[in-house]
Curated annotation (Swiss-Prot):
Transmembrane annotation, as ranges: 86-106, 110-130, 196-216, 224-244, 278-298, 301-321, 396-415, 420-442, 474-494, 497-517, 563-583
Molecular function terms from GO: phosphatidylethanolamine N-methyltransferase activity
Keywords, ordered alphabetically: Endoplasmic reticulum, Lipid biosynthesis, Lipid metabolism, Membrane, Methyltransferase, Phospholipid biosynthesis, Phospholipid metabolism, S-adenosyl-L-methionine, Transferase, Transmembrane, Transmembrane helix
Biased composition (Polar residues): 346-357
InterPro entries linked to this entry: Phopholipid_MeTrfase, Phosphatid-EA_MeTrfase_fun
Family (UniProt): Belongs to the class VI-like SAM-binding methyltransferase superfamily. CHO2 family.
Cytoplasmic side stretches: 107-109, 217-223, 299-300, 416-419, 495-496, 584-922
Protein name from the UniProt record: Phosphatidylethanolamine N-methyltransferase
Subcellular location: Endoplasmic reticulum membrane
Keyword ATP-binding found: no
Function field: Catalyzes the first step of the methylation pathway of phosphatidylcholine biosynthesis, the SAM-dependent methylation of phosphatidylethanolamine (PE) to phosphatidylmonomethylethanolamine (PMME).
Biological source species: Aspergillus fumigatus (strain ATCC MYA-4609 / CBS 101355 / FGSC A1100 / Af293)
Species classification: Eukaryota, Fungi, Dikarya, Ascomycota, Pezizomycotina
Amino acid sequence: MDRGLSTGAHQADDGLRERTVASQSSSAPGLEALTATGEGEVKDKAGKGKKTYGRTPQGKVFTVPQTHDMVSQLLSPSEPKNLSDVIVLAILAAHILLLWRLPAGVKVPVFAFIYLFWRGAYNAGIGWLLHNQSNHRTLVRWAEKTKIFVNPATGQNPHANLYKLIKRELETKIPADYSFEDAPIEYNTWLVFRRLVDLILMCDFTSYCLFAIACSQRPFDEGTLMTVLRWSAGIVLVLFNLWVKLDAHRVVKDYAWYWGDFFFLIDQELTFDGVFEMAPHPMYSVGYAGYYGISLMAASYKVLFISILAHAAQFAFLVFVENPHIEKTYNPPPPRKRTIEQENVSITPQRSDSPSAPASVDEQVPHAPSYSSGPPPSVHNLLGFRNLDLYRTIDTSSILIQFLVFALTVLTPSTPWFQFLFVANAAVWRIWYSVGIGFVLNRQSNCKAWTRHFVKYGESPQEAWNQWKGTYHISMVMCYASFIAAVWKMYSFPADWGYGLVLLRHVLGAGLIALQIWTSVSIYESLGEFGWFYGDFFFDESPKLTYDGIYRFLNNPERVLGLAGVWGAVLITSSGAVTFLALMSHILSLGFIQFVERPHMQKLYGRSLRRDAGLTKSLKRSLPPSLQQLHGSVDKIFDESFEFIEELIDTARPKLAAGVNTFVKDTSALFQKYPARVTISRIDEDLAGYDLRDYSLEIEGTDSLSPNDNDQSGREGANARMPLDRRGDLKNLVFEYGSPIKVKWTAPLNHSKKDWIGLYRVTDNTSREVTRVSSQGRWIAVNEGSYDNLTCEKGIVSSDILIPASQRKDNENRDLASGEVIFSGDKLFWTQGVFEFRYHHNGKHNVMAISRPFEIRISRFDEDEIPLMNPTSVELSLFPVVRNCLDRDPQIAPETVDEPFGGLVERDGKYAKRVVFAVHQM
């Protein structure tokens, strides 16, 4: 729907492998051509070809050689072959031979296991590698640690034979513009990773086809016509799948096909057309149509179910691996705004005796309210389980109404009379949801009737907006709740799931329901709550018209996909009454789009509305000219028919009254919690030769302003009220909430490079020799390059600084190594309590040193001082706490009390929760 295109921010077209591409800065010398043209493809000196330039995370620029897809490399006789190709082909041949040799009774389970193994290697195995490469550069760090790409002549690579093998394999595949010795380690690592991907993907597809062959059959009661139709449909789906893959590879090339942006970036503006204009994530959505085509040809539910499982696993791969990398790489938070735009309003009072111009008539009107025409700020979202708030009337009402509908549906019998009542109830709510809500929106669009009603009684347009959202939400809930209740009443459990197409109808119906849910979620993600509740009907200063998300491919996704679930219910129930409800719902939805949304969008946005969406453009380009003209004629007839109906309705339009409910303002916050680091306690047997006196930990932090020596509250005994008698010079360590803590460590010169320091509650570990509690990510390595991730190195300041024996305080005659690390951000506990640091040996959990216990405390306001406080003192008290809660990050933490937060605060809800907790404790 076009009204959904009024979102808050414009996003560019998809980039690498369906990504939103952010422009990459080019600062490397010698690439003036790139920066001048914005492209990374530059003609060589002969002018015969183009070269693509890549850029490593360290900024090194190199030429990306041309490569070919895996099918051509493996099967094309014109492509050079190497040992890895022979191994892959041999494994594929072994799969085929196994199908031929196995007994008929074991072929299906064996190949089901083989396929699931390769599918797991794809989605779980490759997914794990890519996830760690994206977050910790794990694959590149493995290559750096093993030095397999370093020339053995330097004496640093102990794997000379492996080096020669890899060099020969890669240079055989890329004969031009490639030098194994000169290529960056990121590029060489990617090439080796490609060979692993080739093996897994080829075995995955081959084993699936062999499994389908093992399961293939022809139903005994199937006619010739049905067989021809089944095979024809299957072949069409397979050919369509093949076209999707080929066209996608034409667009993204090998770089995105093999997840090259997990290793390096290319300085190139990519143009996305073809299949990428047809559907979101075409490689993972319509790119699996061939699986269902093969299922049709095999006529096997086993193949169908394993295809659905594989498709679901691929979407999980997209959600948990690719999408986080896309957001991190191509959609970073907006740049920090250091300036504040002040409103042109003077708050300086004027003297009564100063001359002034006479006030206008409008200014002399008492209590004349003025309202902003812009949309209200986001405070509290309405949709989604995370935004459920039982203190809100609309949320409580929705739950109670749904519970009532559910109770009536379950407790009443499924007699014809009750079935009629439930179907009639669903029809009434659908009519209200489309016709009633449409009438209200039409009046709001033409004369602001809804807003004027509330302003007439002294309310603000924001209050009218809140009441409208409640009305629309409760109407939507009742529309679908009543429809589900009617479907439940009309549904009868199958007596025989194997009879006819019963099972297939249920599978297809469930798929259509899932499609509608996905469509609704995609629409909401593109629109936000402002667009979902038709905010541009209520506020003139609507956000800029954009086409992103699902609207990049479809102008009105709810026209077909948005109602797929109701037709899924028709397939599942095979009921005439449900078919009537589905048909009525579809007709009313089309009328709502034509008579309510479309006129308003044309009036509001005019010529900025596009005529054809991405899918329509792709289909039109593929049609011959005669069919394109026919398409235009059909559109004209369709528009004229709707205009006639619109004129007919305008002559006899009923006057409807609108209901009222309540709702408050919305907020935007994305909660993404990173999984905790799970560790297993291990005791290192090689502790001989290490003296615990050589290990030590000293900590420094920002002292808390809260008093910690005299905590008497009057509840103690007489002796406990006496001043604390200290027999040493050490005072309790009390640090600010969220402030970084510096840890200085010492260790023997021969200490393990895999030593690490963890942060724990004092009460977490009863043993002082071995740590048996997970650090949950609150740990830092003492040396860089010792682990396969970068997170544990965040915070290292210095390592292995020599301390001569003469500077030791314990008079020992051994030199020591020392270093510093800083714990901050996610490596801290965001609560109050008493904590300690532990120094561990060799990547294990043997404790070599424990720091002094220290307390994290939030300073509280004295109740006696609160009446004397002014806003300035409150701001100055909260300011350091807020900065600590935002990790003192200059990109998000304010430098002054008037400066706004950075964009990342809105994306990650942990920052808001930290601030709320701290203010509550204060």
